[in-house]
């Protein structure tokens, strides 16, 4: 992989490099750093490709994969990568911070790093509670709080979920044209509204 990195660095070292070959070189450079566990460098290289694609410098064919791998690179860091992502993104004027935190959260959840997942999802909610996939993040938060046996906190969060996604909410007004996302929101509300009285009943018993 070191030889590949050296070769890709030579190709990507030209500021005016554009087009499909440049995109592939950028992507594979990031991939090579990821494969040798240099996760922060990999994340930066994926970021460079995404920003270039968004600016029209490179084709965006690999953008979704690059977002996933950038999130994976951060989440593979000690501590789940949320703090490193925050530090890196602090002075960056990009529109995909919410998407990155969502993906970092899901990557951490997939690896049973639950505290780190919640940290990332809460960061997402802090910067954009109207994010299109916010309902899935909120469902994950409730699931994790239950796994952590934080039952009171999970119950309190269910009320937040119901309020966040009702038909009068800012989230709904922004995302109502996306049926799959609305379905996720309705599922989150339905689950919360079923569990709220069950928990209250169990507490009173």
Model segments located where?
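Acidic, polar-rich low-complexity tracts and alpha-helical solenoid repeat scaffolds
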Residues: 1-205
């Amino acid at each position: 992989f070191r030889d590949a990195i050296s070769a890709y660095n030579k190709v990507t070292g030209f500021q005016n490099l554009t087009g499909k070959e440049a995109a592939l070189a950028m992507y594979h450079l990031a991939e090579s750093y990821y494969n040798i566990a240099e996760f922060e460098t990999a994340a930066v290289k994926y970021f460079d490709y995404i920003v270039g694609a968004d600016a029209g410098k490179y084709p965006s064919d690999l953008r979704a994969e690059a977002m996933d791998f950038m999130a994976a690179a951060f989440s593979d860091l000690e501590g789940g990568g949320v703090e490193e992502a925050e530090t890196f993104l602090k002075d960056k004027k990009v529109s995909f911070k919410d998407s990155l935190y969502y993906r970092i959260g899901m990557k951490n959840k997939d690896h049973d790093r639950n505290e780190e997942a919640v940290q990332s999802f809460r960061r997402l909610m802090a910067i954009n509670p109207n994010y299109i996939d916010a309902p899935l993040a909120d469902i994950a938060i409730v699931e994790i709080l239950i796994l952590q046996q934080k039952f009171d906190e999970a119950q309190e969060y269910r009320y937040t979920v119901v309020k966040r996604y009702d038909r009068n909410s800012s989230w709904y007004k922004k995302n109502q044209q996306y049926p799959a996302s609305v379905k996720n929101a309705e599922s989150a509300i339905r689950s919360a509204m079923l569990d709220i009285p069950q928990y209250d009943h169990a507490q009173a018993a």
